[in-house]
UniProtKB/Swiss-Prot annotation:
Induction (UniProt): Slight level decrease after 3 days of iron starvation.
Biological source species: Arabidopsis thaliana (Mouse-ear cress)
Binding residues for substrate: 187, 306-308, 637, 642, 800, 881-882
Entry's localization field: Mitochondrion
Protein name, entry field: Aconitate hydratase 2, mitochondrial
Length: 995
């Protein structure tokens, strides 16, 4: 089905670059250039921040790049948002795109317009006359253009450009580069803590005697409020409005704070609740592909505080997820330090078979890439099969980059991209400019022309014709199950020991049935019964083909007299208002409604755990039993405990299959042999009887999806709704903290901060707070969903007069460190080896042997001034780019995490918070070394940061006499400088305050 090969990219001894903070020193800060000057020794690490403030010069800004049409662009909408609120301070944004002294001014070239005139100037890659460029992956060419555009031999040197040009050699050597994205995108779960940090940083800068207004984004920042909605109401015509009203009731304080931030900080656009999902809005509207700033052209690029920011890669825009602390630094002019990545070339051939969806393809690709190993790498797709994939199909694959572990899943711009830009309302002139620029700069793929062979780190190949219908689960996105094998796989999961593919249900209990009464009618639940069926998530609701496919399945089922059982919690949460428009035009929305798939809101719901409560009768039937109910959703993640506390089995599926499983009422079914229901005349109805043909879907999509829908949806996107407009936000540079607030609280990170960095911290005789196995996710570390009534966070809230109905979710309270510290490691499905396999958010306090909540145990250690560490297995911190998964452990007093391997973003977040990430040597882990977690650990690091090297060996000793060697996972000199300062944000504050 697919082929793997290793390319001839040459290997050499790893040589770490030592560039910290090529901080911009020109009169205006660069939009997308790396900016860090070399740090060769401790003097530079400790002193460079004194000159760093030059990069944080607040720039006045010009109008944001327009889509070119008369409808509202991000620029005009930002202006509307400011003009509609009296307290808003008007400003102009300037995009500084060129360094004052430029090493590559000779290749600055004019891009002519057809018929005369020019679009503007750009740095021409072909003008370098370097044959290596033609072999570079397209994703790497974006990094190259950025380095060239900003090269002045101070911010970025010719040596940096050479590293990227020589990618075939340097990509194997852990070479460090700096990168500045053109913009930053946030959602509210991560955006609120970002604003809390920025507000707190203003206080810290003021306390150090400097001007707090220096803390201001220097690049465009878009914050889309999409994570706060919960499915409290479903299966009713007014569900969306009721959920929106309850969302505002729960989050009034947070939303008021966000509204304050939109006026207090320059360069920030807040998209109000009820507008859509951040990544779908980014894809359909915010994505530029190419910036045209005052006649200067350069590629769009973006980082976001959500791991699925990668969805924009499907549009040919370089984008990936980062932690909130990295995003904050990027906003403030700090370069992103990254290791120049390897790029896996993934060739697609053939075409998808009849009945196979883009969801089936992405689940297949996820499994292949997860097996291949792509952590820390770019994946670039190419081949003749690309012409068979719509832009929405590509975006679906790019969206799930975090699930297959890659930094990006990149699709270079081609004709399909241009057609999508036109479909979504970008003007013809804008699309023409984008095509002209990318063709001129060797960044456009034309499959009608002979293809230049590009070099990749390794190669994969997939014949699209081999992809078959499938779902993934029950606990991980990459555990793909062919649909034809699902029944057998389900029974194997019941049999298997507890694990990612097992529930250990005794044979004699596998046929257990729980009978109950639902609205006075008899009902029953057994293992595999579907209790949640959700068409949700930007992964699939951005794709008209699968959405129309789901509606057609619902219509055909209704026509045959089939109906979803009333106790199944069905929901439809589109990622943008456009979905509602084309479902209405197609006439198929009514069919979804008949099957219970009413629109419940426009945002992230079931996919992130905002699924709401089950019906009390259903919940009571499950509670106190060993029944394993199932959820089926069209999302991108199904980690245990994420979707809903009572659905222990969670499967990812295409929207049409979500409808099919809802009709069947169980995952314990063989769709080939067993019916999904019975007609009124007693005849069986099979999945094949309701499944639409590809041609049928394509015809409806062509008729129903129109450019005018995108224009009308986005031209008023910042106008919000009456609930948003009624919010009254203060107007002030500094935020007035309310000590009694349980949503917004001043964090303790910068209190008693001194002007000089503290240097490395000793980790001596530390206790093990937690001992984990493999695949501990950020959901385990810092859950986003419900606050359990017996948790430390619940006790904290109740002590402050908050009743359980108003707890809201952990995600909604990320602006309050006191709640979030108590919520760290509070996932009810967490497994801690110190408790010998017992499941739950507890641990053993080693000195006393007491079983305590993780928070209470950590508090005891902190009170006694005893350090703590964490032991972990492979893939520690996988999942969402959740900065609280690093902030929380810091507040609990964790000094180091020793793991077999780390997920990319989480490792970076740990480094950004000053927690030491350490990796066991290959073939070793806590178990092979005989570590139980009851030992005390000392990490032997030099006391001067100048004596520490990125990636060096570090010896760890225990009080039992055992010692072992780990690899220090501070990967760059930049991260060592952050560690020296106690984290990235203290580094930035000292940089600004040193003036």
């Amino acid at each position: 089905m697919y082929r793997r090969a290793t390319s001839g990219v040459r290997s050499a001894s790893a040589r770490l670059s030592s560039s910290l903070s090529r901080i911009a020193s020109s009169e205006t800060a660069s939009v997308s250039a790396p900016s860090a000057s070399s740090l060769r020794n401790q003097t530079n690490r400790s002193k460079s921040f004194s000159s760093a403030l030059r990069s944080f010069r607040v720039c006045s800004a010009s109008t944001r790049w327009s889509h070119g049409g008369s409808w509202g662009s991000p620029a005009s909408l930002r202006a509307q948002a400011r003009n509609s609120t009296p307290v808003m301070e008007k400003f102009e944004r300037k995009y500084a795109t060129m360094a004052s002294e430029h090493s590559y001014k000779d290749i600055l070239t004019s891009l002519p317009k057809p018929g005369g005139g020019e679009y503007g100037k750009y740095y021409s890659l072909p003008a370098l006359n370097d044959p290596r460029i033609d072999k570079l992956p397209f994703s790497v060419r974006i990094l190259l253009e950025s380095a060239i555009r900003n090269c002045d031999n101070y911010q970025v040197t010719k040596d940096d450009v050479e590293k990227i040009l020589d990618w075939e050699n340097t990509s194997t050597k852990q070479v460090e580069i700096a990168f500045k994205p053109a913009r930053v995108i946030l959602q509210d779960f991560t955006g609120v803590p970002v604003l809390v940090d920025l507000a707190s940083m203003r206080d810290a800068v003021k306390n150090l005697g400097s001007d707090p207004s220096k803390i201001n984004p220097l690049v465009p920042v878009d914050l889309v409020v999409d994570h706060s909605i919960q499915v409290d109401f479903a299966r009713s015509e007014d569900a969306a409005q009721k959920n929106l009203e309850l969302e505002f009731k729960r989050n009034k304080e947070r939303f008021t704070f966000l509204k304050w931030g939109s006026t207090a900080f320059q360069n920030m656009l807040v998209v109000p609740p009820g507008s859509g999902i951040v990544h779908q809005v980014n894809l359909e509207y915010l994505g530029r592909v190419v910036f045209n700033s005052k006649g200067f052209l350069y590629p769009d690029s973006v980082v976001g505080t959500d791991s699925h920011t990668t969805m924009i890669d499907g549009l040919g825009v370089a984008g990936w997820g980062v932690g909130g602390i990295e995003a904050e630094a990027a906003m403030l002019g700090q370069p992103m330090s990254m290791v120049l990545p390897g790029v896996v070339g993934f060739k697609l051939d053939g075409k998808l078979k009849e009945g196979v969806t883009a969801t089936d393809l992405v689940l297949t690709v996820t499994q292949i890439l997860r097996k291949h190993g792509v952590v820390g790498k770019f994946v670039e797709f190419y081949g003749e099969g690309m012409s068979e994939l719509s832009l929405a199909d590509r975006a679906t694959i790019a969206n799930m980059s975090p699930e297959y572990g890659a930094t990006m899943g990149f699709f270079p711009v081609d004709h399909v991209t241009l057609e999508y830009l036109k479909l979504t309302g970008r003007s013809d002139e804008t699309v023409s400019m984008i095509e002209s620029y990318l063709r001129a700069n060797n960044m456009f793929v034309d499959y009608n022309e002979p293809q230049q062979e590009r070099a990749y780190t390794s190669y994969l190949q997939l014949d699209l014709g081999h992809v078959e219908p499938c779902i993934s689960g029950p606990k991980r996105p990459h555990d793909r199950v062919p649909l034809k094998d699902m029944k057998a796989d389900w029974h194997a999961c019941l049999d298997n020991p507890v694990g990612f593919k097992g529930f250990a249900v005794p044979k004699e209990k596998q046929e257990e049935v729980v009978k109950f009464s639902y609205n006075g009618q008899p009902a029953e639940i057994k293992h595999g019964s579907v209790v949640i069926a959700a068409i949700t998530s930007c992964t699939n609701t951005s794709n008209p083909s699968v959405m129309i496919g789901a509606a057609l399945v619902a219509k055909k089922a209704s026509d045959l007299g089939l109906k979803v059982k009333p106790w199944v919690k069905t929901s439809l949460a589109p990622g943008s208002r456009v979905v509602e428009k084309y479902l209405d035009r197609s006439g198929l929305r009514e069919s979804l409604t008949k099957q219970g798939f009413e629109i419940v809101g426009y945002g992230c719901t079931t996919c992130i755990g905002n699924s709401g409560n089950l019906d009390p009768e259903v919940a009571s039937a499950i509670e106190g039993t060993d029944i394993i109910p199932a959820a089926v959703l069209s999302g991108n993640r199904n980690f245990e405990g994420r979707v809903h506390p009572q659905t222990r089995a969670n499967y990812l599926a295409s929207p049409p299959l979500v409808v099919a499983y809802a009709l069947a009422g169980t995952v314990d079914i063989d769709f080939e042999k067993e019916p999904i229901g019975t007609r009124s005349d007693g005849k069986s109805v099979y999945l094949r009887d309701v499944w639409p043909s590809n041609e049928e879907v394509a015809q409806v999509v062509q008729y129903s999806v129109l450019p005018s829908m995108f224009k009308s949806s986005y031209e008023t996107i910042t106008e919000g709704n009456p609930l948003w407009n009624e919010l009254s936000a203060p107007s002030s540079t500094l935020y007035s903290w309310d000590p009694n607030s349980t949503y917004i609280h001043e964090p303790p990170y910068f209190k008693n901060m001194t002007a000089n960095p503290p240097g490395p911290r000793e980790v001596k005789d530390a206790y093990c707070l937690l001992n984990f196995g493999d695949s501990v996710t950020t959901d385990h570390i810092s859950p986003a969903g419900n606050i359990q009534k017996t948790s430390p966070a619940a006790k904290f809230l109740m002590d402050r007069g908050v009743i359980s109905e108003d707890f809201n979710s952990y995600g909604s309270r990320r602006g309050n460190d006191e709640v979030m510290a108590r919520g760290t490691f509070a996932n009810i499905r967490i497994v801690n080896k110190l408790l010998k396999g017992e499941v739950g958010p507890n641990t053993v306090h080693i000195p006393t042997g007491e079983k305590l909540s993780v928070f209470d145990a950590a508090s005891k250690y902190k009170t006694a001034e005893q350090d703590t560490i964490i032991l972990a297995g492979a893939e520690y911190g996988s999942g969402s780019s959740r900065d609280w998964a690093a902030k929380g452990p810091l507040l609990l007093g964790v000094k180091a995490v020793i793991a077999k391997s780390f997920e990319r973003i989480h490792r970076s977040n740990l480094a950004g918070m000053g927690i030491i990430p350490l990796c066991f040597k290959a073939g070793e882990d806590a178990e092979t070394l005989g570590l139980t977690g009851h030992e005390r650990y000392t990490v032997h690091l030099p006391t001067k940061v100048s004596d520490i090297r990125p990636g060096q060996d570090v010896t760890v000793t225990t009080d039992s006499g055992k010692s072992f060697v780990c690899t220090l996972r501070f990967d760059t000199e930049v991260e060592l400088a952050y560690y020296d300062h106690g984290g990235i944000l203290p580094y930035v504050i000292r940089s600004l305050s040193a003036k």
